[in-house]
């Protein structure tokens, strides 16, 4: 038997044969090496303190049974000697598994085992980590023993003197390094030595060890991730059944969890409120309205939360460990779990907060509980209610809050009027309730108080500055505010109050005994009885100023009020922070991590688990944990209208759909934008195809298409064009303005297409010249392009001679175009067509002409640029055919002979004549290009000349009073009449400064002279310039760069001098010259660097300091000097001090000089514009040889594609559209006169029509059939092709326009069905129409409303709004009813502004609240109090919630609201408790557009939801709470959940669903 076997036999009490068996098979010899003290017993579990002073507690006792025979490889000797990877493979039985040990990816052995008495240890999660910790700790212990053995050997005496080993491979150093590495891992744990013992009864080996946690008691512990993970897995009590009790749905794949939260709260509220025994009377004193039963339930719940009926008997004297956990979680911080000690451990168990790391003993927790109970008994610790009243909108949350205030008023003792807070501020206890609400409903709160509880004394707090106007001190303001029962303020005011709330005068350092000012907010010096946040979701995040200020305010009770308190995951932190639920109101942010993890999972489309759990520092945290907090601590209740329908009696709300058709002008405008979208997105008209754009791009286009359904001009387009019309921004764009805009857009596009076609043609010819080297072919191409350009300029712009020097190409000058730019009318061979095409003189004709002139100048300028390029390249072609041949002959002859070449000896006579002719043509074409270049640049050159002339006039030496140069300061530097050293020092400083300023003046004026020479130089060349230069403009442009750089540098240096001069004149501290005189990173030219180095800048003591010292000296002198010398001394000091007045004059003078430099800067800007245009011309002439191979290939592909017919088709189509648009005004009149537009082929009515370039109209199908067989117009016989056809929709009949909404549409019914989108769930369009009709009612009087006459048209939707308002007003007058009041909701602020202008035009009194400003509440209050105000314009997102507007019986939803909650909020403004009449919602929709697609698709989603509910056996009721019983996956039923953006899976349907 080996020695090791004997050791094992003795220590483990087993037979030697068994030990030798294991040793022979390589089982445990290396294990024994790692465990040097096998004969020691395990560490006593009573050990309490670690070596570093931290306390210890046993967190895991591991006993693993291993079979007697182990299949072990030779590598198994590495166990515990090196860090190993351990994997646990679970077996069928919970306490059995397979242990897999590997090292360096090599499997060492597998052991089947089972756990003994370790039910808390999760085999699959905890055990691998625990074993890994054990391996680390035992290896560290072995290495420390090894190191100690080496040291003990070195300490033995030796006769030989050993040298100190400095080798980096020294074993001792390596050991220390390895020990250090191991000590950094799992530093929060200690592990006992591993003990092997043999169990004779089970014939197994048992591996045992204890794992202990090192911790600091009554302190925050920063545990490692591994420590938190083991503690969380071992001790966290996660009761899944508790959650499922109130929440029936699996979890979602989205951050948007509003429906899930409210579904849970509704379930909880039913259970919680049913347990409350009613105790409120039927009528509440001082409340002028009786509460409904469900309202009494809510008030009773809040009263109980605030301590009603609670007595000390409710708090037991002694509580167990479970009770302590609940107490600590509710009253201190959420997250405490119990770490129980094992029976053989000494000491109390621990409470560990998994979110903060704080640990305390159960004894300490019991002490805190006893202290709390004692304070409750003495009244020092009142019950502090925290909660959210989340009643559905319209159920009377305001009345419930007022009832709470009336029923539970604070009783204060005079002896306890104040207390000192943690920041040493004196806080006054008050009876007051602080209500914070949005601006929009602040007045509404005051009205409700006056109407229902006018015994309550209230005050509107408007901020620190306002209240301090009436109070002398902050303490006085506090005493004044304490007198009120209610203080009402807004979120905006609270946000501005945050800095005053943070101010603390008790910690301000000061030299005086009492502070001069106190900027403390009076709100921060009061302890309110309760704070109520109405629409609490308005806090948005805990980092906003409103949230910060609210958190600083002292209160007893904390309430939030909102119908939708939780919308997304991050709202949990906002609500919990406001309710002061620790640790969520502190820095630890588990919720943000959870939100980000879910976002990442969604982006990866990882939906493998319904309940997503994230880990923060090893601690598990999920949405379930967030939701559980609310019912675990009774934080929120809610009633829905569906639940209390039997108690409330709200009259019916009618939901009308108003389908409208575009007028022909609007329809063409929409189709043009739609076609642009299709072209850019890659979709086909039926929704097929592969999009090439992002979802953000699609959302942007959807927004544009939705806006154009409301008004045909985008705000930015309208603004730009009205500015061109001399700034008439207040003018409303009517339908004629829209037509003008459409024509201008079409004409602008046509110019672009023509420009592109000619440009590509020039590049094609240039390719033939430079790359193909075929000058003869290139010559032919360029001549054709030149001729085509000349014809185009003559026909399109009526310009006969492009070389006319009087031609005006300026786009920005105010003078009108010459008559040469007048439009030519399209001729036609038919009299009726000429009558249609004959334009009327409309009121906006001048505006049309001005915009047209602007665009035509722009187009002519583009064509002139192309003509210039063409002439230049023609010169290049003739150069290749003429001059270049002579140059090649010269070069060849120069190499062979010295004498000059005789060209007649080289070329035949006829060829030489041809060369000479080509040389003359070369010069002629280059000259023509130069003339055109000057003509193109003439407007920019004129601007430069005008600005130079203006500057010369302003700065004329004899007539100008405008300062440009600096002036010297006169000063006597020699005679110093100072009476003392102080004055003398001032004299010398002043003398030095003035001397420096005068030198600086000289420096400035010299630079200015240099600037004037350069800046006054003209930009264009004279007629004597060599116009035959082939590189036109290159030399000029090169010179201009140098000139512009000099001007820029000089202007910059002059400004630096003025700035330095201002500092010397006005600074109160020492002036320092900046290290960098120009911004860092700026490119500095050599010339600019020289200028900067030559600047004369002044540093040191400024003038103001000198004058201050001089004044101080005079004060001292007056006290000490005699009267005899007073007069002389004073005169000298006064002489010096007069320069103080002079310095102020110099500062003003510097300001005037700076303004003068701005005039010179305008010359620089004008020159820059000129040279930029010159550079663009030069860039257009770049040789193709300078392009890279990919660039050249791309150019060739573009030429082949575009010139192959694509551009011609676009040009033909848009020319036909221009003719159509020109005739639309006449067609509009035809429609108004009830005339019919007939097709000349089939003689039928034109509905879906087409127009060709000659201006004739036909049915679309007729003309397409005709042109397939003919190439001429059926009427005028003019040539035309299919590419010239422009299609349009034209409906005349009112009956067709207002088809019954329930009728099925058959056109294109299947267009969207082939799409693979899974949301296209209804294939039968008649079923879609049925769903559409089920949700909305039909307004049967819609035709009568259409017949109402209005004096001007602004578009289909705006026109009908005006007509419907007029109809409602006339109807109310006939019925002797009150005048109607209407709320107009839209998501487009700019559209509401347009509506407001139209309402004003028709004398319809209205008010607008487009954003949540300070006066919005007053505006809404005026609407409620003044029946004469017909309309209130509101923005859906900013003012859709919280308003009580039951005075308005009508709500206009001007455009589809994407988010269901926002839509219901808007519809609920008048459909609430207190409404005694039927109300009406009018949904405006433009047929055959994205608006109709959106509304239809929302109906389909509702049907899908209804079907899924029916499958689950749940009853679906449309009247139910909008968020009750919803499917948990919101993305399936919500088109939009954030900021009116459509989610990815619904985008396609919004564009194409049900499209024709």
Swiss-Prot record:
PTM sites of type N-acetylserine: 2
Zinc finger (RING-type): 1239-1277
Domain of life: Eukaryota
Domain Helicase ATP-binding, chain residue ranges per copy: 378-583
CDD domains with a match to the protein in the record: DEXQc_SHPRH, RING-HC_IRC20-like, SF2_C_SNF
Induction (record text): By heat shock and UV radiation.
Stretches with biased composition (Basic and acidic residues): 145-156, 817-827, 834-846, 1297-1309, 1508-1518
UniProtKB keywords: Acetylation, ATP-binding, Helicase, Hydrolase, Metal-binding, Nucleotide-binding, Nucleus, Phosphoprotein, Stress response, Zinc, Zinc-finger
Record domain Helicase C-terminal: where: 1363-1531
Keyword Acetylation belongs to the record: yes
Gene3D superfamilies (alphabetical): P-loop containing nucleotide triphosphate hydrolases, Tandem AAA-ATPase domain, Zinc/RING finger domain, C3HC4 (zinc finger)
Phenotype upon gene inactivation: Displays increased levels of spontaneous RAD52 foci in proliferating diploid cells.
Biased segments, Low complexity type: 1310-1319
PROSITE patterns per UniProt: HELICASE_ATP_BIND_1, HELICASE_CTER, ZF_RING_1, ZF_RING_2
Catalytic activity, EC: 3.6.1.-
GO MF assignments: ATP binding; ATP-dependent activity, acting on DNA; helicase activity; hydrolase activity; ubiquitin-protein transferase activity; zinc ion binding
Gene coding for it: IRC20
Binding site for ATP: 391-398
Family membership: Belongs to the SNF2/RAD54 helicase family.
Cellular localization per UniProt: Nucleus
Keyword Nucleotide-binding recorded: yes
Acidic residues composition-biased segments: 1519-1529
Pfam families named among the record's database cross-references: Helicase_C, SNF2-rel_dom, zf-C3HC4_2
Annotated protein name in UniProt: Uncharacterized ATP-dependent helicase IRC20
Gene Ontology CC terms: mitochondrion; nucleus
Residues bearing PTM Phosphoserine: 810
């Amino acid at each position: 038997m080996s020695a090791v076997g004997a050791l094992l036999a003795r220590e483990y009490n087993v037979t030697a044969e068994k030990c030798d068996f294991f040793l022979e098979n390589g089982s445990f010899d290396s294990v024994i090496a790692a465990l040097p003290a096998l004969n020691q017993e395990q560490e006593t579990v009573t050990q309490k303190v670690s070596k570093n002073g931290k306390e210890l507690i046993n967190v895991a006792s591991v006993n693993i049974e291993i079979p007697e025979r182990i299949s072990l490889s030779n590598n198994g000797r590495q166990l515990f000697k090196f860090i190993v990877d351990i994997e646990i493979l679970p077996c069928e039985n919970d306490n059995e598994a397979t242990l897999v040990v590997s090292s360096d990816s090599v499997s060492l052995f597998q052991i089947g085992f089972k756990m003994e008495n370790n039910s808390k240890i999760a085999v699959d999660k905890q055990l691998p980590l625990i074993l890994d910790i054990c391996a680390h700790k035992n290896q560290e212990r072995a290495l420390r023993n090894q190191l100690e053995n080496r040291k003990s050997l070195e300490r033995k005496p030796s006769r030989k003197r050993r040298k100190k080993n400095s080798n980096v491979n020294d074993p001792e150093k390596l050991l220390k390094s390895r020990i250090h590495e191991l000590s950094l891992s799992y530093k929060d744990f200690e592990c006992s030595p591993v003990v092997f013992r043999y169990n004779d009864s089970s014939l197994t080996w048992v591996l045992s060890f204890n794992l202990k946690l090192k911790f600091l008691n009554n302190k925050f512990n920063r545990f490692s991730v591994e420590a938190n993970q083991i503690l969380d897995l071992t001790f966290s009590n996660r009761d899944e059944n508790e959650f499922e009790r109130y929440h029936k749905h699996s979890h979602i794949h989205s951050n948007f969890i509003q429906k899930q939260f409210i579904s849970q709260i509704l379930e909880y509220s039913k259970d919680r409120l049913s347990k409350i025994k009613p105790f409120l009377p039927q009528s509440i004193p001082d409340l002028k309205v009786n509460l409904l039963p469900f309202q009494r339930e809510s008030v009773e719940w809040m009263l109980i939360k605030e301590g009603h009926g609670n007595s000390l008997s409710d708090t037991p004297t002694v509580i167990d460990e479970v009770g302590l956990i609940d107490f600590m979680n509710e009253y201190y911080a959420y997250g405490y779990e119990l770490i129980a000690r094992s029976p053989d451990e000494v000491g109390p168990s621990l409470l560990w907060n998994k979110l903060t790391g704080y640990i305390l003993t159960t004894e300490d927790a019991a002490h805190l509980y006893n202290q709390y109970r004692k304070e409750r008994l003495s009244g020092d610790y009142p019950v502090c209610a925290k909660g959210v009243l989340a009643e559905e909108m319209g159920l009377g949350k305001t009345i419930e809050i007022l009832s709470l205030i009336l029923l539970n008023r604070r009783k204060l003792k005079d002896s306890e009027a104040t207390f000192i807070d943690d920041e040493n501020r004196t806080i006054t206890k008050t009876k007051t309730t602080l209500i914070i609400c949005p601006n929009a409903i602040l007045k509404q709160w005051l009205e409700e108080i006056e109407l229902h509880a006018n015994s309550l004394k209230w005050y509107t707090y408007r901020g620190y500055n306002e209240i301090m106007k009436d109070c002398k001190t902050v303490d006085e303001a506090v005493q004044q505010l304490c007198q009120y029962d209610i203080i009402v303020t807004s979120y905006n005011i609270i946000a501005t109050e945050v800095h005053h709330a943070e101010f603390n005068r008790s910690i301000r350092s000061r030299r005086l005994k009492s502070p001069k000012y106190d900027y403390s907010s009076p709100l921060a010096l009061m302890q309110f009885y309760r704070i109520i946040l109405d629409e609490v979701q308005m806090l948005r995040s805990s980092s906003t100023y409103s949230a910060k200020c609210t958190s600083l305010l002292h209160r007893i009770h904390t309430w939030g009020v909102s119908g939708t308190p939780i919308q997304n995951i991050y709202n949990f932190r906002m609500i919990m922070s406001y309710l002061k639920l620790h640790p969520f109101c502190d820095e630890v942010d588990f919720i943000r991590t959870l939100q980000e993890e879910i976002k990442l999972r969604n982006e990866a489309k990882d939906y493998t688990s319904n309940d997503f759990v994230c880990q923060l520092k090893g601690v598990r945290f999920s949405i379930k944990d967030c939701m559980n907090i609310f019912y675990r601590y009774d934080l929120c209740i809610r009633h829905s209208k569906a639940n209390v329908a039997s108690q409330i009696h709200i009259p019916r709300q009618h939901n009308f759909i108003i389908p409208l058709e575009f007028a022909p002008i609007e329809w063409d405008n929409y189709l043009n934008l739609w076609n642009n979208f299709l072209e850019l997105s890659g979709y086909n008209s039926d929704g097929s195809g592969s999009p090439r754009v992002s979802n953000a791009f699609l959302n942007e286009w959807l927004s544009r298409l939705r806006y154009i359904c409301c008004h045909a001009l985008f705000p930015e387009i309208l603004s730009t064009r009205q500015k061109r019309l001399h700034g008439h921004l207040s003018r409303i764009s009517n339908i004629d303005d829209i037509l003008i805009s459409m024509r201008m857009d079409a004409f602008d596009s046509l110019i672009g297409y023509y420009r592109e076609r000619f440009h590509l043609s020039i590049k094609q010819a240039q390719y033939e010249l430079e790359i193909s080297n075929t000058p003869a072919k290139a010559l032919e191409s360029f001549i054709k392009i030149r001729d085509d350009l000349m014809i185009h300029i003559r026909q399109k712009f009526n310009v006969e001679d492009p070389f006319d020097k009087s031609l005006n190409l300026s786009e920005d000058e105010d003078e009108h175009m010459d008559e040469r730019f007048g439009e030519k009318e399209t001729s036609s061979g038919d009299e009726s067509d000429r009558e249609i095409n004959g334009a009327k003189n409309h009121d906006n004709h001048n505006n049309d002409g001005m915009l047209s002139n602007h665009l035509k100048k722009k187009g002519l300028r583009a064509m002139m640029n192309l003509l210039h390029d063409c002439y230049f390249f023609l010169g290049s072609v003739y150069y290749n055919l003429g001059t270049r041949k002579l140059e090649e002959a010269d070069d060849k002859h120069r190499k062979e002979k010295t004498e000059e070449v005789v060209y007649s000896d080289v070329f035949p006579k006829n060829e030489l004549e041809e060369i000479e002719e080509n040389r003359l043509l070369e010069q002629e074409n280059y000259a023509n290009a130069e003339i055109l270049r000057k003509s193109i640049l003439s407007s920019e050159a004129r601007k430069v000349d005008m600005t130079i002339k203006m500057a010369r006039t302003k700065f004329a030496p004899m007539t100008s009073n405008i300062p440009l140069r600096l002036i010297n300061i006169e000063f006597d530097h020699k005679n110093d009449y100072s009476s003392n050293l102080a004055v003398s020092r001032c004299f010398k400083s002043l003398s030095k400064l003035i001397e420096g300023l005068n030198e600086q003046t000289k420096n400035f004026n010299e630079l200015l002279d240099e600037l004037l020479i350069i800046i006054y130089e003209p930009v264009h060349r004279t007629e004597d310039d060599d116009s035959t230069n082939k590189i036109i403009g290159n030399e000029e442009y090169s010179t201009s760069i140098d000139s512009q750089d000099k001007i820029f540098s000089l202007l910059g240096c002059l400004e630096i001098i003025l700035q330095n001069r201002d500092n010397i004149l006005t600074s109160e501290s020492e002036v320092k010259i900046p290290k960098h005189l120009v911004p860092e990173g700026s490119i500095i030219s050599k010339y600019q660097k020289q200028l900067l180095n030559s600047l004369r800048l002044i540093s040191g003591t400024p003038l103001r300091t000198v004058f201050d010292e001089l004044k101080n000296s005079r004060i001292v002198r007056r006290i000490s000097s005699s009267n005899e010398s007073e007069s002389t001394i004073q005169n000298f000091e006064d002489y010096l001090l007069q320069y103080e007045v002079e310095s102020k004059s110099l500062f003003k003078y510097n300001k005037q000089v700076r303004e003068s430099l701005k005039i010179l800067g305008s010359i620089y800007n004008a020159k820059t514009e000129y040279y930029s245009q010159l550079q663009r011309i030069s860039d257009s002439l770049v040789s193709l040889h300078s392009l890279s191979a990919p660039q050249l290939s791309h150019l060739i592909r573009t030429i082949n594609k575009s010139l192959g017919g694509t551009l011609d088709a676009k040009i033909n189509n848009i020319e036909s559209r221009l003719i159509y648009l020109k005739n639309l005004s006449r067609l509009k009149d035809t429609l108004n006169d009830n005339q019919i537009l007939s097709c000349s082929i089939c003689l039928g009515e034109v509905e879906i029509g087409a127009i060709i370039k000659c201006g004739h109209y036909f049915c679309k199908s007729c003309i397409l059939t005709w042109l397939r067989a003919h190439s001429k117009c059926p009427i005028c016989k003019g040539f035309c092709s299919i590419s010239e056809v422009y299609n349009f929709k034209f409906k005349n009949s009112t009956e067709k326009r207002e088809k019954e909404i329930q009728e099925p549409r058959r056109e294109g019914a299947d267009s969207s069905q082939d799409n693979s989108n899974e949301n296209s769930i209804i294939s039968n369009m008649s079923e879609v129409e049925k769903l559409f009709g089920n949700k909305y009612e039909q307004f049967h009087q819609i035709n009568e409303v259409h017949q109402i006459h209005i004096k001007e048209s602004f578009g289909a939707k705006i026109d009908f709004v005006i007509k419907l308002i007029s109809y409602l007003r006339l109807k109310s007058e006939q019925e002797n009813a009150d005048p109607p009041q209407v709320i107009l909701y839209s998501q487009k602020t700019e559209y509401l502004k347009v509506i407001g202008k139209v309402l004003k035009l028709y004398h319809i009194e209205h008010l607008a609240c487009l954003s949540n400003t300070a006066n919005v509440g007053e505006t809404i209050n005026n609407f409620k109090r003044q029946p004469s105000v017909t309309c209130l314009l509101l923005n859906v997102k900013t003012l859709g919630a919280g308003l009580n507007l039951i005075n308005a019986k009508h709500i206009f939803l001007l455009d589809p609201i994407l988010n269901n909650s926002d839509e219901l909020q808007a519809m609920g403004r008048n459909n609430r408790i207190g409404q005694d009449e039927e109300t009406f919602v009018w949904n405006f929709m433009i047929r055959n557009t994205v608006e109709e697609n959106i509304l239809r698709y929302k109906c389909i989603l509702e049907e899908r939801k209804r079907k899924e509910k029916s499958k689950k056996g749940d009853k679906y009721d449309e009247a139910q709470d909008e968020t009750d019983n919803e499917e948990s996956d919101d993305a399936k039923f919500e088109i939009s959940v954030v900021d009116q953006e459509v989610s990815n899976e619904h985008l396609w349907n919004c564009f194409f669903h049900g499209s024709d």
